[in-house]
């Protein structure tokens, strides 16, 4: 009977250790996914900032060109 208890205890202990290791790996994978999502959102934000600045520059250039055309037409 004592041998059976020891075997059962050993099986339960090893199962618990295995479960703990699996949960830890799962948490690490989730953390990596969250970190990748953060990196992607930072890249998107950076890209949108560049597009915004380019748009502003193009808008200013177009406004200046239209203003010059109007000034030339008035003269």
Swiss-Prot record:
Species annotation: Cruziohyla calcarifer
Tissues in which the UniProt entry reports expression: Expressed by the skin glands.
Propeptide segment residues: 23-43
Keyword field: Amphibian defense peptide, Antimicrobial, Cleavage on pair of basic residues, Secreted, Signal
A GO term from the CC aspect: extracellular region
Family per record: Belongs to the frog skin active peptide (FSAP) family. Cruzioseptin subfamily.
UniProt GO BP: defense response
Predominant localisation class: secreted
Protein function: Has antimicrobial activity.
Annotated Acidic residues bias: 30-41
Identification of the protein by name: Cruzioseptin-7
Compartmental location: Secreted
Domain of life where this protein originates: Eukaryota
Annotated stretches, region: Disordered: 25-44
Secretion signal, residue range per the UniProt entry: 1-22
